[in-house]
């Protein structure tokens, strides 16, 4: 959306875009597919299982290079994602875990479903002007985007990094978009601040109370990279106070 706003020639609506924040985002699958080493290093798979994941990942990368994005997605889905495949994913079979948004949890917290009823209340419907429209959870949208998921948007991100404030953040406990995978992707972006970012010091970020470490930050120019401690894929759910502090600093800083 941000790239479309940036490149619009005669937009119907003028949007004063100032920046974007990307949280645990699949930006460039080809450089973010190293699940084998990550899962091995956090102890969720052994060396044999890691070897299987590595081989499957290489096949998916080749499909991406060949423009076979749907085939690449099917490997990703069977390996970890588990949204489309009928049987459990390989990750589920070898780890026993149903939840890949936080490696400290084995199952999805029931609290994650509470919002469904809340957003459909009359008060919320009125506040967000949706009338009696049916609430959808996104599954139908995903089904229509299967061929797009494995496509890279790194070239678009590069353009945005040269023109706007950009923050990319990851929860330390996320599996499906793990921090090392994002860091690897960032290292491959060809932008004007790349060399400076390589040498940029990593700074400690404290919680609002100053009593604990919220995470770590690296910043060069208008680009900020953040690792958030004690959080997984769903940062506002795991660490709401820290999430608010982070986004407030980004907007107002």
Where are these regions (language model features)?
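Terminal and linker regions of secretory-pathway proteins
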Residues: 1-253
């Amino acid at each position: 959306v941000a790239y479309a706003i940036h490149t619009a020639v005669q937009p119907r609506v003028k949007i004063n875009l100032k920046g974007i924040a990307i949280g645990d985002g699949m930006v460039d699958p080809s450089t973010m597919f190293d699940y084998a080493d990550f899962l091995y290093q956090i102890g969720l798979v052994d060396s044999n299982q890691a070897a299987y994941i590595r081989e499957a990942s290489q096949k998916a990368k080749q499909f991406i290079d060949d423009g076979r994005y749907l085939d690449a997605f099917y490997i990703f889905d069977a390996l970890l994602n588990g949204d489309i495949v009928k049987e459990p994913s390989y990750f589920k079979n070898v780890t026993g875990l149903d939840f890949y948004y936080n490696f400290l949890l084995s199952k999805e917290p029931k609290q994650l479903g509470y919002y469904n009823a809340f957003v459909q209340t009359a008060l919320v419907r009125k506040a967000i002007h949706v009338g009696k429209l049916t609430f959808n959870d996104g599954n139908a949208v995903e089904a229509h985007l299967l061929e797009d998921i494995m496509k890279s948007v790194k070239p678009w991100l590069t353009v945005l990094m040269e023109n706007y404030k950009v923050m990319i953040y990851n929860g330390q406990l996320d599996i499906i978009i793990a921090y090392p995978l994002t860091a690897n992707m960032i290292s491959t972006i060809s932008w004007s601040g790349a060399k400076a970012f390589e040498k940029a010091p990593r700074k400690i970020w404290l919680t609002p109370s100053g009593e604990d470490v919220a995470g770590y930050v690296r910043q060069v120019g208008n680009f900020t990279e953040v690792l958030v401690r004690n959080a997984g894929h769903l940062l506002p759910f795991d660490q709401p106070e820290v999430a608010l502090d982070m986004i407030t600093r980004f907007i107002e800083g």
